[in-house]
């Protein structure tokens, strides 16, 4: 399919991207029309997709998209969440018309409604989830391209690109690859230099995961500021200006502090006024008497 041209052959970095994203991993079920794209079957029942056939169909789909004179006449659709961001990014890069989310029935057939469109080419992410636009495309003789898994029905699909259309990374990578090949065939970007757009921008991210990451980053920033504040706070006793002393042997003149004066009385000069050997006081006698009476 690549015409035996070296520039159109699949590079090693492309294969590594496919393997890292899990594009070659299909499902446990197999449609009879997808048997031609299967390489092997694993011991756990998962079918392995032949990436060589995936690359050939990717180039064929890119040629079909480039053949449309007006890029806006190409409609790209994804009703599933995993492909909506990729569809929007693909449309922004190639000029296609995106439909991300629910497809309104009658968009291609009902001329009365405001959302009526007449595209010349349709690209969908999942033939099973996007069955409505595929069915309407068959009514108006609209050629279709679809990312197909091992169990995807190929009814009303003209160009099937075998790949894993369930994983978020695989779907994002396939749309990124398709956008890159379209731009290369149009001459917008060169094949000699890598595309500056990263595949990560086409990946779907769960809003809950993004919120959790933002909260974790905010908490980490707060704890880091508190930690730095505790250790970087200036201590007043160490940062106070110290007096300059030319000769350290002289020392620093310490300001004199008034010392509280206490009476210097001679305790031995006091007259002896009490005899410790005298008899106990009357009060003690009374207590003794009281004790004797009680006894």
Curated annotation (Swiss-Prot):
The modification Phosphoserine is found at residue 43. The record marks 115-116, 133-134 as: Cleavage. There is a cross-link at residue 89 (Glycyl lysine isopeptide (Lys-Gly) (interchain with G-Cter in SUMO2)). The modification Phosphothreonine is found at residue 97. CDD domains: RPS2 (cd01425). Residues 214-240, 263-295 are annotated as: Disordered. It is found in: Cell membrane; Cytoplasm; Nucleus. Keywords: Acetylation, Cell membrane, Cytoplasm, Isopeptide bond, Membrane, Nucleus, Phosphoprotein, Receptor, Repeat, Ribonucleoprotein, Ribosomal protein, Ubl conjugation. Residues 54-113 are annotated as: Interaction with PPP1R16B. Residues 214-227 have a biased composition (Basic and acidic residues). Residues 161-180, 205-229, 242-295 are annotated as: Laminin-binding. Its main location: membrane. The keyword Ubl conjugation applies. Pfam families: 40S_SA_C, Ribosomal_S2. [DE]-W-[ST] repeats lie at residues 230-232, 247-249, 266-268, 275-277. One of its GO terms (cellular component) is plasma membrane. The modification N-acetylserine is found at residue 2. The modification N6-acetyllysine is found at residues 52, 89. One of its GO terms (molecular function) is structural constituent of ribosome. Monomer (37LRP) and homodimer (67LR). Component of the small ribosomal subunit. Mature ribosomes consist of a small (40S) and a large (60S) subunit. The 40S subunit contains about 33 different proteins and 1 molecule of RNA (18S). The 60S subunit contains about 49 different proteins and 3 molecules of RNA (28S, 5.8S and 5S). Interacts with RPS21. Interacts with several laminins including at least LAMB1. Interacts with MDK. The mature dimeric form interacts with PPP1R16B (via its fourth ankyrin repeat). Interacts with PPP1CA only in the presence of PPP1R16B. This is Small ribosomal subunit protein uS2. The gene is RPSA.
């Amino acid at each position: 399919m690549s015409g035996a041209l070296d520039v159109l052959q699949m590079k090693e970095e492309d294969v590594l991207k496919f393997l890292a994203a899990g594009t070659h991993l299909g499902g446990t079920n197999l449609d009879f029309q997808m048997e031609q794209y299967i390489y092997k079957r694993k011991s756990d029942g998962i079918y392995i997709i032949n990436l060589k056939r995936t690359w050939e169909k990717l180039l064929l789909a890119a040629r079909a998209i480039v053949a449309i004179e007006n890029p806006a006449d190409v409609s790209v659709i994804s009703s599933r969440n995993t492909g909506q961001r990729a569809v929007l990014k693909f449309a922004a890069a190639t000029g296609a018309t995106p439909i991300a989310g629910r497809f309104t029935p009658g968009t291609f057939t009902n001329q009365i409604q405001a959302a009526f469109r007449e595209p010349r080419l349709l690209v969908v992410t999942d033939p099973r989830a996007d069955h409505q636009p595929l069915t309407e495309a068959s009514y108006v003789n609209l050629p279709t391209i679809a990312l197909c898994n091992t169990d995807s029905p190929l009814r009303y699909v003209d160009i099937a690109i075998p790949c894993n259309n369930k994983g978020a990374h695989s779907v994002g990578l396939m749309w990124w690859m398709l956008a890159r090949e379209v731009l290369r065939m149009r001459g917008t970007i060169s094949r000699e230099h890598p595309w500056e757009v990263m595949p990560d921008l086409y990946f779907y991210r769960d809003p809950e995961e993004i919120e959790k990451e933002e909260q974790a980053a905010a908490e980490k920033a707060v704890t880091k500021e508190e930690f730095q504040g505790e250790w970087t706070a200036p201590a007043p006793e160490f940062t106070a200006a110290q007096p300059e002393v030319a000769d350290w042997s002289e020392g620093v003149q310490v300001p004199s502090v008034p010392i509280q004066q206490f009476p210097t009385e001679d305790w031995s000069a006091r007259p002896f006024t009490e005899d410790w050997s005298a008899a106990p006081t009357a009060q003690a006698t009374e207590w003794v008497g009281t004790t004797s009476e009680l006894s």
